[in-house]
Amino acid sequence: LKILNNEICDRFETITFDLGFYCNPYYPSITESQDKKNFFITHSFGYNWLLKNINSFDGLINFCGSASYFSKKSNIRKSINRMIKMFKLDPSYVLNDFFKNSGVQFEKPNKLMNNKLLIDSLHVLRDENLTTIEYKNKAPQQNIFCKDDRIMKIKDLEKLDGDLVVDGDHGFPYKFPRKASEIILNFLKQNNEL
């Protein structure tokens, strides 16, 4: 989010992770120190990756991600099973369908997609319930879900008490970067970081 980076670059170091679906994975090391806090912003599967791979953090802003949404309900598990089966036959078809349901235009990347990593990630979504990890960390967390999300439907979410529900779909932070930045800045202000 370039807009956000312009707002906070003088106070925060911004580090970007890439899970490697369309290019080489990039997981920079995060150093924990007394004088630096680690706040994370995730989207979709990035939330699951974070819960599995980052031991602690000082704050988390999560757009459209869930630790257990995909593993708990049988109809959703069946849908992921279909995606896995179809992905083996025609990855572009599945990705095009996913992006369409996310409200984002799919553009086949110039480089080769990492099909194995994409399939492995679908298995993680289907098979792993990460809620035990999710609640170990008592750091402030803001979950943002979207009213028109066709990937993670609001009606199927279990816990919405402290979560923020906004207008938009699964592609919200990409399609509305200014609104996403406002949510992030507000979270940082509420937690005395700005």
Describe each model-derived feature in a short phrase.
Residues 137, 143-145, 149:
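Short beta-strand/loop motif that positions the catalytic acidic residue
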Residues 23-37:
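Conserved acidic catalytic loop of the alpha/beta-hydrolase fold
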Residues 41-50:
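Gly/Ala-rich beta-loop-alpha elbow adjacent to hydrolase catalytic centers
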Residues 15, 39, 59-63, 142-144, ...:
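Hydrophobic/aromatic beta-strand patches that form the interior of the parallel beta-sheet core
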Residues 55-87, 117-126:
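Flexible "cap/lid" loop of the alpha/beta hydrolase fold
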Residues 1-27:
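Short, surface-exposed "cap/lid" segments of acyl-processing enzymes
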Residues 89-129:
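Conserved alpha/beta-hydrolase catalytic His-Asp/Glu region
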Residues 151, 168-183:
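Catalytic histidine-centered segment of alpha/beta-hydrolase-like enzymes
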